[in-house]
Curated annotation (Swiss-Prot):
Involved in copper export. The keyword Transmembrane applies. The gene is copA. Cu(+) 2 binds at C83, C86. It comes from Staphylococcus haemolyticus (strain JCSC1435). This is Copper-exporting P-type ATPase. Belongs to the cation transport ATPase (P-type) (TC 3.A.3) family. Type IB subfamily.
């Protein structure tokens, strides 16, 4: 049966009619597809049969031609979800909606992340689909508004719990009569008194369960509300039946279960309240990041006057004044003044960093001592901190593959539990205690209320939220839950050398000669822009050397440099340069070879026809590199260096830090090939690089880890970003993934084990309904509480 549908795609990258014609021709070659591409509106209108194609098929076709399709991303706040069945149902409906590329719904954060094609659908349509299911949705609020809303919800839950507890306590005491054979005042045993207390709990305080159950059943779904409504209603209405019999003249005191329905609702509300409180703590890491942001800025207007303005009023190119002790409000560039900036909130480096004119400063870092004027370069959502917050938010809202089993089971969970409860009732009334309706009913109610789909739904996302949040506090940004799980499987870590294991810039590592010799070399090298020359000049400045005038400076390609100082010739360069000018180097030759064998670039110094000394320069290894490699080795993880540098230098550095294998002389475009070779050997590979030159290898690896700084967070290039470039965070990231996945497995074991053991025990009549309800209420609390242990995770 044909199912025709029209789709509209917004296409980018078209520059002329040839582009639009090419796309249109290619789309129309697809079977049973009619397409028109409009260059002016940059839209493609496509008529197709949904039995043959999905919208993503056309997107892929356009992208293969070298163009792209506009994709929007929406974040929605959802209210009314009570368990995993709710979040799974919403997710399925959104993913089936026309124009939706991908949707994930997180029960813990109560949010949906939807990527969609704007020509096909829009935000209002997506919200409408969620509301049709019986839930409420709205565009994501600001963190402040969300916090206020959740505080109000928590207060509302607490108030309902308090009222329910007050009404339930007298009924709970009637349970104690049966358990401990206690004597209670007659009024507590009076059916009318129990009815008056239980009814508002059932139909006012517990009305939310009926509403939730109705909305789900109306849309063909089942969730926790259905179980609670069925279980408590069975107990309540059976008690009404017994009351009517007694009121009609029955001589025996009725067997009432008002206390069962009332106490069940109270216990479930108690569990939900504890769960909400615990879940609010899972977002602490994100809240702390948000609190780092400055609230206002000191703007210098066109007249040179200062005025304080809210942060959202600062624009790019605005001039801002920052005084000592104030936060840098936005990313910018210093145009006046100098200071030291505490960047520890982004890089983890405790020592303030000196900043001068033209240096870049990062929003939300702290100005420690000087008065500076900056020009804003990035504001709002473009700042480094905003990008970090975005990564953490997306990671905390994402799903890990390990969650799939729980999602599948929770989709069928409630109908299966209802079937088991019905079967339990039939077995009890026909086989266990034939004709004993009450015993059968109690066993069935226990089955209904002990089953807990909530624990299944919370097991993975709460651990992901807390684990990624804790990692972010330590400068480790996971892109999503999927990458937490994949990092856990890594057995080989490949390192780029320059900028990853080393500082990425040459430094003087050895100097042999007197201060006058250093003056000569630095004065000559001050005429060069070469990185080695810069390293020598910086070294001289550190040793308080005063430079002198140089004439006839000349670069000698492949050899070094020459210059005239005080009418005498200076040569700085390699062994061949010295030999060409008959300079005797025997006294220094052995030391030179030793330094070169260790990967240093050695330059000999001759002045006025005589050897004056030697200076060696190298890209020095980071202090933490050796310890990082040792930590990886202790975790039984193989380490590899992949570099474009020469083999001698690479092996020297590898030996210094303890790396297992060296692959040297590799061009950037060939690095991905070597990653593939390791993967073909059945290794799960993580690639650690700078996120720019190593982009192909980062993408090819099972896990790409980018070493970023506050201004160069390579978020798009890698699955994990290490802030500040501290290589010790690489083993810590892997350790964090191990801890988080272990926590998830503990949660899933508890969630599955609880239901697998609890339901049969309840079916055998070994648990009173109120005990079963208490167990259900506390099961999800225990899962969230276990996840919160990750907040204390040591990295």
């Amino acid at each position: 049966m044909s199912n025709k549908q029209n789709a509209t795609l917004n296409i980018t990258g078209m520059t002329c009619a040839a582009c639009s014609n090419r796309i249109e021709k290619r789309l129309n070659k697809m079977d049973n597809v009619k397409a028109q591409v409009n260059l002016t509106t940059e839209k493609a209108t496509i008529e197709y049969d949904t039995n043959d194609y999905a919208i993503n098929d056309f997107v892929t076709t356009v992208q293969k031609l070298g163009y792209d399709v506009v994709i929007d991303k929406a974040e929605l706040d959802i209210t009314g979800m009570t368990c995993a069945a709710c979040s799974n149902r919403i997710e399925k409906v959104l993913n089936k909606a026309p124009g939706v590329k991908d949707a994930t719904v997180n029960l813990t954060t109560e949010q949906a992340m939807v990527t969609y094609y704007p020509g096909q659908t829009d935000l209002d349509t997506l919200i409408g689909r969620i509301r049709n299911l019986g839930y409420d949705a709205q565009p994501k609020q600001s963190e402040e508004d969300q916090a206020t809303r959740k505080q109000q919800e928590l207060k509302h839950k607490r108030n309902k719990l308090m009222i329910s507890t007050i009404l339930s306590l007298p009924l709970l005491m009637t349970m104690l009569v049966h358990l401990f054979n206690m004597h209670l005042p007659d009024i507590l045993m009076n059916p009318w008194f129990q009815f008056i207390l239980a009814t508002p709990i059932q139909f006012i305080i517990g009305w939310q369960f009926y509403v939730g159950a109705y909305k789900n059943l109306r849309n063909g779904g089942f969730n926790m509300d259905v179980l609670v409504a069925l279980g408590t209603s069975a107990a309540y209405f059976y008690s009404i039946y017994e009351m009517i019999k007694w009121f009609s003249g029955a001589t025996n005191m009725p067997h009432l279960y008002f206390e069962t329905s009332a106490v069940l609702i109270t216990l479930i509300l108690f569990g939900k309240y504890l769960e909400a409180r615990a879940k609010s703590q899972t977002t602490n890491a994100l809240s702390e990041l948000l609190n780092l942001q400055a609230k206002e800025a000191r703007l210098i207007d066109d007249n040179g006057m200062e005025k304080m303005v809210p942060l959202n009023q600062v624009n790019v190119d605005d001039i801002l004044l920052i005084k000592p002790g104030e936060k840098i409000p936005v990313d910018g560039q210093i145009i006046k003044g100098e200071t030291a900036i505490d960047e520890s909130m982004l890089t983890g480096e405790s020592m303030p960093v000196d900043k001068h004119v033209d240096d870049v400063v990062i929003g939300s870092t702290m100005n420690t001592n000087g008065v500076i004027t900056i020009m804003a370069t990035k504001v709002g959502k473009d700042t480094a901190l905003s990008n970090i917050i975005k990564v953490v938010e997306e990671a905390q809202s994402s799903k890990a593959p390990i969650q799939r089993l729980a999602d599948i089971i929770s989709g069928y969970f409630v109908p299966i539990v209802i079937a088991i409860a019905l079967l339990t009732f039939l077995i009890w009334i026909t086989l266990v205690h034939p004709g004993q309706f009450e015993d059968a009913l109690v066993a069935a109610i226990s089955v209904l209320v002990i089953a807990c789909p909530c624990a299944l739904g919370l097991a993975t996302p709460t651990s992901i939220m807390v684990g990624t949040g804790r990692a972010a506090e330590n400068g480790i940004l996971f892109k999503g839950g999927e990458y937490v799980e994949r990092t856990h499987q890594v057995d080989t870590v490949v390192f780029d050398k320059t900028g990853t294991l080393t500082h990425g810039k040459p430094e003087v590592t050895y100097f042999e000669g007197d201060k006058d010799t250093l003056t000569l070399v630095a004065s000559a090298e001050n005429n060069s822009e070469h990185p080695l020359a810069t390293a020598i000049v910086n070294y001289a400045k550190q040793h308080k050397v005063n430079l002198v005038n140089v004439t006839n400076y000349q670069t000698l390609p492949g050899h070094g440099i020459q210059a005239i100082i005080d009418d005498s010739m200076l040569f700085v360069g390699n062994q061949k340069l010295m030999l060409d000018h008959q300079i005797n180097i025997q006294s220094i030759k052995q030391k030179m070879k030793q330094m070169e064998a260790e990967g240093h670039t050695v330059m000999l110094i001759a002045y006025d026809g005589k050897l004056r000394g030697m200076i060696a320069v190298a890209d020095t290894v980071k202090a933490s590199a050796k310890e990082a490699i040792q930590q990886l080795s202790s975790m039984n993880i193989r380490t590899v260096m992949l570099t474009g540098d020469n083999e001698r230098t690479a092996k020297a550095i590898a030996k210094e830090v303890g790396i297992d294998q060296v692959i040297a002389g590799v061009l950037p475009e060939d690095k991905a090939h070597h990653i593939t070779q390791l993967q073909e050997q059945k290794h799960n590979v993580a690639m650690v690089g700078d996120g720019i030159n190593d982009a192909p290898a980062l993408v090819k690896a099972d896990i790409g880890i980018a070493m970023g700084t506050g201004t160069e967070v390579a978020i798009e290039a890698a699955d994990i970003t290490i802030l500040g470039g501290d290589i010790q965070l690489v083993p810590k990231a892997i350790h964090a993934s191990h801890k988080t996945i272990r926590n998830i497995k503990q949660n899933l074991f508890w969630a599955f084990g609880y239901n697998i053991a609890g339901i049969p025990i309840a079916a055998m009549g070994l648990l009173a309904p109120w005990i079963a309800g208490a167990a259900m209420a506390l099961s999800s609390v225990s899962v969230v509480s276990n996840a919160l242990r990750l907040k204390r995770m040591k990295l």
